[in-house]
Regions:
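Active-site and adjacent substrate-binding regions of carbohydrate-active enzymes
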Residues: 1-184
Length: 184
């Protein structure tokens, strides 16, 4: 019960590791001899729920996500994560891109960026002109000055179907990358 006095929501980082994780033999200097191991799966979450109950949980399902990881997120009932900054990657520019807000399921949580991402203003300055134009086209916003564009992205995230929206303070304040939380 004490944990619930400290936190309203728990985010499970690297959720995919509960489906499968990459195991590297002890002492190996590289991952060359590693292999995939089956994780505990839904059984672990059911056991925790029976013994502790759940408050609010978010499944961090970013990165390399397989069909079995997607199924585990679905079976758990936890909302997955959507990161708005990922929506405008020119390598995945089709309208089916899972990170474009019109594709968010209701059972998801949208972040403008996470602790590992650039701030919105820093990110927008760092992407290509093509990606900047793709983002402005999606926003239907060709006129807002770049230094204020973070407000349009925040509004976009808040209008999405995601049931929760998390905005880092740096993004609300329109700060640059000198104020980012982490550089992984």
């Amino acid at each position: 019960w004490y944990v619930y006095q400290l936190y309203d929501v728990t985010r499970i980082d690297h959720f995919r590791g509960f489906d499968e994780y990459y195991s590297i033999p002890y002492g190996d200097k590289t991952a060359e001899n590693g292999h995939w191991e089956k994780g505990p799966g839904i059984g672990l979450f059911r056991c925790v729920e029976q013994n502790l109950g759940w408050h609010e949980v978010i499944a961090e399902d970013l990165g390399y996500v397989t069909d079995s990881v997607r199924q585990l997120v679905k079976d758990s009932g936890f909302p997955g994560m959507k990161v708005l900054e990922f929506a405008f990657d020119s390598r995945d520019s089709g309208s089916a891109n899972d990170y474009l807000p019109h594709n968010y399921p209701e059972n998801s949580v949208v972040y403008t960026g996470t602790h590992d991402n650039e701030t919105l203003n820093g990110w927008f300055k760092s992407i290509t002109k093509e990606e900047q134009q793709m983002a402005r086209d999606y926003l239907c916003d060709q006129r807002t000055p770049q230094k204020l564009l973070h407000q349009s992205f925040i509004a976009l995230a808040m209008r999405s179907a995601a049931r929760m929206c998390i905005i880092p303070l740096q993004d609300y304040l329109g700060l640059d990358n000198s104020c980012r939380i982490n550089t992984p």
